[in-house]
Amino acid sequence: MDSLGLNRTNSDFISSGQLGGHEEVSCFRDYTIHNIVATININKTVNLEDVMKKLRNAEYNPKRFGALIVRIRDPRCTALIFKSGKIVLAGTKSEEEVKLAAKKFKCIGNLKQDDTTPRIHNMVAVGDCKFPIRLEGLSIDHIEFTTYEPELFSGLIYRMSEPKVVLLIFVSGKVVVTGATVLVKQSEIEDAFKKITPLLLNCRKV
């Protein structure tokens, strides 16, 4: 998990003194947004060859892949532009970066500001509660929400109903939150970390 390249922190945290009398511990003080996937739909057909001439760091080989690939440096982002007018943005690390990346594509078809409003579809965040976790106990206590098969995958999968996100929980205390297949906001990622904290404290290894 250390190879994830975490580079953005968030100061929100939960003090365990607020969680049923546990000793004072700060969980997920420095969780990070690792990747955001968003889309733009400009609702018009795009001539990808013409667009490639307008944009730097663009690649288009229709025999290999049906989209134009564009790499942006500031903010760091990779975009896939399809003929249908759909644009997929990946690699940003905040909602602000998503909006900034979307503005880079206003040159396509003389777009208006409203045409580049991005929709976030998936957000991946990583946190560390700083203590080891009894995954077997967590799985037993919350069997209706969890999948734990250590012979296949070392982490426990926790499917949270509200907010609707998936958490990958590891014995080391590392937790990955992803909003796969749903429209997710950063505030929901924060809520997920808050809601999972008391469960992890109850299954803390001693």
Language-model features, listed with the residues they occupy:
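Intrinsically disordered, low-complexity polar/charged tails and linkers
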Residues: 1-166, 172-174, 181-206
